[in-house]
Curated annotation (Swiss-Prot):
Xref: Gene3D superfamilies: Cytochrome Bc1 Complex, Chain C
Claim: Coiled coil is one of the keywords in the record: no
GO cellular component: mitochondrial inner membrane; respiratory chain complex III
Top-level division of the source organism's lineage: Eukaryota
The entry's keywords: Electron transport, Heme, Iron, Membrane, Metal-binding, Mitochondrion, Mitochondrion inner membrane, Respiratory chain, Transmembrane, Transmembrane helix, Transport, Ubiquinone
Phosphoprotein in keyword set: no
Gene name as annotated: MT-CYB
Principal location class: mitochondrion
Residues given in the record as a ubiquinone binding sites: H201
Protein name: Cytochrome b
Binding site for heme b b562: H83, H182
Cofactor: heme b
Length: 379
């Protein structure tokens, strides 16, 4: 009798995705982040579900309901901080996952890559709306500032902003709809992740060398299931350490003050994972220009496959491109630092230079360097 896992309509989907999947024999730990992102999504959906049981999306009671969760609900503090810091872990894994894709040329799988870019946008939108829900000072002013950016769109801008707000300012209607969207989006993300995997399994995984691994495949289970479990344990260790020892490390103290439309915080800034994009937004002294740069800073990822000029897929054997890749990483870290600083000298000029370098590296310097490397190898 044929094995049930290979014949049962549901089991064979799981089997062909996680058990008998032919995988390259040489993929490194940089390939662990897909499964870790799946785990992060599951953690966020579960903790979010339990938070939603006690949360009220009303301007009068939202802040109090979060306080109630932390003080009165059994292990409510744990659920709340797992959810808040789980978002940070989610973004760390996301950035490393995208970085891996850029380094090893995984973006050559166009459909997989573009759905990944779409997923990145969806996760960022979800995180932004989630940050508004506790209705603290930074929640309110963050929502006001970011939604206001849409008013830069010519002709329809101001109408669009009022339509999103559901009134003439960020208020009850805004909070209620943000809660609704924040609840539904993770399930859309889960569906998109399924499509992401579907397209990935059409081609099979890339590997560090960037060469075809068709001649040398190993089954996913037990080799990569065990390897993934190690990643999972490290992720859980990091997350629980963060939650139990310093849960507010990555948060903003301003968000422990209830939202007050009459009092603006001295420095409005988003969570750490948006700071690089926020720095790019602020570095352009024009509203529409800043908004365009903000969107393009992520959307530029969709253009990367078309800028691939090298004859090799991976950067593994391309030392000049490697140097530029790490300069790009350093540049993004610089932008993250600048995004959290006040708008004053010398931070303004550093932010502007880092923003210019970011776009120059991806659009101009890296493609030209790849051509130069081809030339060196007489290709």
């Amino acid at each position: 009798m044929t094995n049930l896992r290979k014949t049962h309509p549901l089991m064979k989907i799981v089997n062909s995705s996680f058990i008998d999947l032919p995988a390259p024999s040489n993929i490194s730990s940089w390939w662990n982040f897909g499964s870790l992102l799946g785990l992060c999504l599951i953690i966020q959906i579960l903790t979010g579900l339990f938070l939603a049981m006690h949360y009220t999306s009303d301007t009068m009671t939202a802040f109090s309901s979060v306080t109630h969760i932390c003080r009165d609900v059994n292990y409510g503090w744990l659920i709340r901080y797992l959810h808040a810091n789980g978002a940070s872990m989610f973004f760390i894994c996301l950035f490393l996952h995208v970085g891996r894709g850029l380094y090893y040329g995984s973006y050559m799988y166009l459909e997989t890559w573009n759905i990944g870019v779409l997923l990145l946008f969806a996760v960022m939108a979800t995180a932004f709306m989630g940050y508004v829900l506790p209705w603290g000072q930074m929640s309110f002013w963050g929502a006001t500032v970011i939604t206001n950016l849409l008013s830069a769109i010519p002709y329809i801008g101001s109408d669009l902003v009022e339509w999103i707000w559901g009134g003439f300012s960020v208020d009850k209607a805004t909070l209620t709809r943000f809660f609704a969207f924040h609840f539904i989006l993770p399930f859309i993300i889960a569906a998109l992740a399924g499509v992401h995997l579907l397209f990935l399994h059409e081609t099979g995984s890339n590997n560090p060398s960037g060469l075809s691994s068709d001649a040398d495949k190993i089954p996913f289970h037990p080799y990569y299931t065990i390897k993934d479990i190690l990643g999972v344990l490290l992720l859980i260790l990091t997350l629980t350490s963060l939650v139990l020892f310093s849960p507010d490390l990555l948060g903003d103290p301003d968000n422990y003050t209830p939202a007050n439309p009459l009092n603006t915080p001295p420095h409005i800034k988003p969570e750490w994972y948006f700071l690089f994009a926020y720095a790019i937004l602020r570095s352009i002294p024009n509203k529409l220009g800043g908004v365009l740069a903000l969107v393009l800073s992520i959307l530029i990822l969709a253009v990367v496959p078309f800028l691939h000029t090298s004859k090799q897929r991976s950067m593994m054997f391309r030392p000049f491109s490697q140097c530029l890749f790490w300069i790009l990483v350093a540049d993004l870290l610089t932008l993250t630092w600048i995004g959290g600083q006040p708008v004053e000298h010398p931070f303004i000029i550093i932010g502007q230079l880092a923003s210019i370098l970011y776009f120059l590296l991806i659009l101009v310097i890296m493609p030209i360097t790849s051509l130069f490397e081809n030339n060196l190898l007489k290709w």
